[in-house]
């Protein structure tokens, strides 16, 4: 039918590090004349030849209607963005109440984000180092018998299985080693 349709999905899922089947979802969207809205917030700056994310890495970014990213995480600033056609961006700019009634990024934050995006776009050494460190962490966890969910992204879920123990481990890592780890417990994830 002619009803507007949109498929919203993420490229990298933050809790388990899985990646989505972007090509298949884009094909499904084309089949049903739906827009695609891809969240690349866990991937921009870290994947793709220019840090554009998983879709760029797979050569699929031109087939996505709307790509959402963040200026936090890899870029180390604050704020977010969408990359889309002029028509879609103008529509959001003119009709999106969340956009209309929000405060613009402070100039210093915008400048920092601009420099970070430009740097990561043209210099892949940090992306390579980040992937190497994630791989090293996975190898060390396996060698130590620490249960992790296997995946091919930088996200390394450690499966503790007990909420209280998870909190104690995270606090110990922070107190003794200065390492902050975000604990994720039930009900955010299954028991």
Map each language-model feature to its residues.
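A short glycine-threonine-serine/GTX helix/turn-capping micro-motif
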Residues: 96-105
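Structural motif of enzymes handling amino- and sulfur-group chemistry
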Residues: 104-123, 129, 133, 142-143, ...
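Conserved PLP-binding catalytic core of the aspartate aminotransferase-like
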Residues: 20, 127-137, 142-178
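Active-site PLP attachment segment
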Residues: 50, 56-91
